[in-house]
Amino acid sequence: MAETLISPGVLARENDQSQITSQPVQAGAAIIGPTVKGKVNIPTLVTTYSEYLANFGSTFDSGSDEFTFLTSISAYNYFQNGGTSLLVTRVASGSFTAASSSKVSGNDGLVAGAGTFTTNSFEADGAVTGSTVTEVTGSSNGSGTGAEFAFVFEAASTSSFDSITVTSTGSGYAVGDTITIPSGSLGATGGAGTDLIITLAAGNIQQSNNIFTLETLAEGTIMNSTGPEGATGALDSGSANNIRWEIVNPNTDQGTFSVVIRQGNDRTKSKSVLETFTNVSLDPKASNYVARVIGDQTQTLMGAGTANPYLQTTGSYPNASRFVRVKQVNVKTPDYFDNSGVAKTAYTASIPTAQSGTFGDAVGNILTGTGNYYDNISNSDSQGLVGGNYTDAFNLLANKDDYRYNVITAPGLIYENATHATPLNTLVSNIENRGDAIIVMDLKNYAGTVAGATTTAASLDSSYAAAYWPWLQVTDPDSGQLVWVPASTMIPGVYANNDRTSEAWFAPAGINRGGLGSVRQAERKLTQANRDTLYTGKVNPIATFPGRGVVVFGQKTLQNQASALDRVNVRRLLIELKSYISQVSDNLVFEQNTAATRNTFLSQVNPYLESVQQRQGLYAFKVVMDSSNNTADVIDRNQLVGAIYIQPTKTAEFIYLDFNILPTGATFPA
């Protein structure tokens, strides 16, 4: 079709702009660290703590002690303080593969096997005479693992004639069908050639070793261990963090069955069902195909160890299950009808039997460290990990096209530890490049000092990072134990509470918005002099006040230069403004560089900034996008320039109250 007009006329053209593009994962906060189970190096969005527990687990045993990772404590506190969405990335050490399901076996069943064939050529030690009849039953055809058979020719290595081999790779064959092979197709080794007729007769396939295979999407601390079901239904090595599978309700009339995912430590008579997928089949053409219903996709971290890792997704069907995927279907049933469209009467070869089993054959260790937890975290071991285990996750979350969040933390990494400082510097650099989040980090191990905290802070310079001190004692929500945690474990919850009750540009500090109600005590009760030293040194003190409890009492960033951006609330204000205005600007790319386009921008940005001003985020603002900064030269370079001037609202951090005592009868000043 012509795309231009030569003579006068009308040319109607199509421009499809209805494509649906994938959106980045949106979360309020991002937490990176070890968990009991879950996908490793796969950022996962959760919206409640219950959902977090289902995906990542809670407590675990190490020796005779019970522990909870800081990641879990931080997630609990975040949701308790009003957080609504959390992006969790599990990190691990060691190498491993996911666990697969134990054998999912099926029944014997009626299939279309090779029946009798007649020909005047027959292989028998090179002698070919007369007419011979032979039969090959379905049970001996090929590997005996499917109901579909093809007939192929293979050249004999020691004879001049060909032979017929039956394989299980064909399709469309049904009982009673005939296949005619023209005369001469077998070669010339004596005897007159006549047509070879093969009739497909009924045959029984042997029981399949594995109808289909499930694979876990996540690995437990010791991973999903296989084990037999005992008399009470207990799974050996089973735990609440492992899972098992069960096949129920096999229907030989419909060719369907149901898949149940159960908790690993449940009992046959007291099942703890996590998920159920009903009436699935092995028919890849059907909407209830088991892989389509449960999902068969898996994500693999590519480019590990580089500055630009990414996730590669393989598989055809998105995962509806949170715990497993269909790794492979070994016995597919294309349809349940013969070539005449008549329904068959037996489906037992198409479905597994009622049974249950476990997951096993996982290889490797999730945790290879000695396991220093809570206040024992050190340079060489942080919860079974070392600093380098975090790098891939940090670099993966640097991609703002895929992941959005406004605060990020990795509780357990302490900047004073040399092996922790390197990945934390990577994280700071990544967030500065993103420009849309703030990092909450820890400076000192447990039992640090005020001077040590300020000395460590002096080596950092970024308005996208903030540090808090000292450590805090909290009650582990899952084990009930009192444990010591670094401040970054709790601060995302403070930010969540601040945003729930106020706005992002309000200071997440002070009695009203900085209270740490779930904290039992701070590692150290800071004096006024301690707080002064810390705040002068860019460290936000966590103070203890009688009757008020433990309170975040500072909101500085780690920026060295004294400016508005050395405060957390101003940095977060800029993040909010840039995020909204950038989205407005995205819609202008490739639009005409005219006054109309500029007015479109102004008509959206000015009202937004007015609303921020009304909500106490700005004292004043001005937006310029006109001919003064979009000259002819700028336009000729295909540029559109806007200038946004803002006066951020400052917080009242230093309040001076002068009490003046006057003599009796004195006049008060105007």
Model-identified regions with their sequence ranges:
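Conserved, function-critical positions that sit in or immediately flank catalytic
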Residues: 113-204, 236
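Short beta-strand micro-motifs enriched in acidic
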Residues: 152-156, 248-250, 626
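Extended Gly/Ser/Thr-rich low-complexity repeat segments
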Residues: 71, 75, 130-134, 173-184, ...
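Extended, Lys/Arg-enriched charged tracts that mediate electrostatic binding to polyanionic substrates
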Residues: 213-237
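Intrinsically disordered, low-complexity regulatory segments in eukaryotic proteins
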Residues: 229-252, 394-399
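Structured, hydrophobic secondary-structure cores that serve as assembly/anchoring elements
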Residues: 1-105, 116, 209, 250-258, ...
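A short, polar beta-strand/turn micro-motif
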Residues: 106, 114-116, 241-243
